[in-house]
Amino acid sequence: MQLSEENKREIKFHDELHGNDKVRFENRFYKALANMFSDFDSQIEQNCKNKRILDFGCGIGNNLEKVLKFSPKEITGVDISKVSLEKAKRIIGDDKSKNINFIHDNCEKLSFVSGSFEVVYGSGILHHLKYDLALKEISRVLTNNGKIIFVEPLGTNPVINFYRRLTPKSRSIDEHPFLENDFSYFRAHFKNVKLKYYGFLTLIFFFFYKDPKNSLIFNFLSNLDQKLFKYKFFQKFAWSVLITGAKN
């Protein structure tokens, strides 16, 4: 497996991150993106039944067990961190893990043959990679008209960027959340690319609700967010984005 210096740093970071059971402080904020993850799951469920699926940068398998319930024909999880893959197997358990192909590989230079998968999805992985290399590989391993479904952080909110500067040890030094111009990489390889933004007011007021599923406050804020995100000005204040498309 060929590795760049950036790849080696990412391996070290994620091996250390997942080599213990500590919960990251930042995890408490992710409830502000509950509607995004719900939409992400819905997109996968609508597209994966009886399909060959790739979890791109599967990490510790946060999505794999869930996607198994959506009846894919075959599901593969690939990650550059052996520590993460082993932890994923432990978390998911032996009975379910035997239904998943776990592959240790470099997402910027995959060993799969072209056209291996009908759907490729990922959560918070692309901003750890070189966009041009990763998206070219995703396109290569997809069948014609194969689908992509990704959620990624944005690097356009000044308050979030300030927090990132204050907490450099919480992320790898090579991370680069998406900027507006970065979406051109998607459009170079995929058609019908759609972006849906999340996490503005739901993040600002996250102290005012506990469980987003049962919160009228969260529902109000998330609906208001979607109205605001129709205007380009407010999109830069989003925390994250859902990206869908199909192979050219």
Residue ranges and their predicted role:
Residues 54, 60-109:
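Class I SAM-dependent methyltransferase SAM/SAH-binding core
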Residues 197-248:
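A C-terminal cap/extension of S-adenosyl-L-methionine-dependent methyltransferases
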Residues 121:
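A conserved beta-strand element that flanks and buttresses the S-adenosyl-L-methionine
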Residues 175-191:
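Short alpha-helix
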Residues 133-144:
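A short glycine-rich, Lys/Arg-flanked "PGG" loop and its adjoining helix->strand segment in the class I
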Residues 1-48, 149-171:
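Conserved class I S-adenosyl-L-methionine
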Residues 67, 138, 186:
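Class I S-adenosylmethionine-dependent transferase superfamily signal
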